[in-house]
Amino acid sequence: MADSEADKPLRKISAAFKKLAIIVNSPNPEVPVTQFSHACSLVSPLFGCLGIAFKFAEMDYVAKVDDLVRASSSISTLVVMMDKDIEADCVRKAGSHTRNLLRVKRGLDMVKVLFEQIIASEGDNSLKDPATKSYAQVFAPHHGWAIRKAVSLGMYALPTRAHLLNMLKEDEAAAKIHMQSYVNSSAPLITYLDNLFLSKQLGIDW
């Protein structure tokens, strides 16, 4: 059924991140790698919907999430995963689970800011401002000139707001509800991840 709940990405994302928010808001949060990586994988199609401007972000995000999905078969929680990398002295090495987690966290943050901007720009059919602001705030500080230039050019090929909602199989009212739900749920999760990196003195700007 084309209109079934399972066929609507925003609803699946909203439900998955609500569950993660409950975990990170608990007194002793332990986030399972399996649950986290599954929720993150549900976000992947959103990057594809944004077209060429976010092609690099999509490829990078999907690859990092896939690594965490594989890691989940043998590692229980995000804390255990980070501790293993710290013990192996490979945190900052390309391909490490912890490094990939930081990249995935930025992807989640970018989508959060994008949704905030889309909600705030209700009535505007262009996604250029929301996409530009979310990219500038989250990704641009970590990208070189060539990638930033390619993204800037790609902004002119973004789908319209109406086309995006059509791809996500939602009307304006429902999309706003589920986008706001993700914003509300992802905020404590992103804070939890930032604090996790900082508590282990790894930093978050690398």
UniProtKB/Swiss-Prot annotation:
Q: Where does an N-acylsphingoid base 1-phosphate bind?
A: D60, K64, R99, R103, H143
Compartments in which it is found: Cytoplasm
According to the UniProt entry, its GO molecular function terms are:
lipid binding; sphingomyelin transfer activity
Altering K64A: what's the impact?
Severe reduction in C1P transfer
Which keywords describe this protein according to UniProt?
Cytoplasm, Lipid transport, Lipid-binding, Transport
Q: Which consequence is recorded for altering D60V?
A: Loss of lipid transfer, but no effect on PCD suppression
Please give the annotated consequence of changing H143L. Answer: Loss of lipid transfer, but no effect on PCD suppression
GO biological process annotations for this chain's record?
Answer: cell death; defense response to bacterium; response to salicylic acid
How does gene deletion manifest? Answer: Constitutive expression of defense-related genes that accompany the hypersensitive response normally triggered by avirulent pathogens. Induction of growth inhibition, premature leaf chlorosis and defense-related programmed cell death (PCD) at the early seedling stage, leading to a lethal phenotype before flowering. Large increase of cell death inducer phytoceramide.
Name the domain of life this protein comes from: Eukaryota
Entries under InterPro entries matching the protein:
GLTP_sf, Glycolipid_transfer_prot_dom
The UniProt entry's GO CC annotations, sorted and at most eight, read: cytoplasm
Signal peptide location: none
Assembly with partners or alone: Interacts with BPA1, PRA1F2 and PRA1F3.
For this chain, the family text in UniProt reads: Belongs to the GLTP family.
General function of this protein: Exhibits selective intermembrane transfer of ceramide-1-phosphate (C1P) and phytoceramide-1-phosphate. Does not transport ceramide (Cer) or GalCer, suggesting a requirement for phosphate in the headgroup for functionality. Transports in vitro sphingosine, but not glycosphingolipids. Also has some in vitro activity with sphingomyelin, a lipid not detected in plant tissues. The transport function may be not directly involved in regulating cell death.
PANTHER family hit by this protein: GLYCOLIPID TRANSFER PROTEIN DOMAIN-CONTAINING PROTEIN, GLYCOLIPID TRANSFER PROTEIN-RELATED
Miscellaneous remark of the record? The clustered Lys-64/Arg-99/Arg-103 residues form a positively charged triad ideally arranged for binding phosphate, explaining the inability to bind sugar headgroups and transfer glycoproteins.
Q: What is this protein called?
A: Accelerated cell death 11
Question: What gene name is listed for this protein?
Answer: ACD11
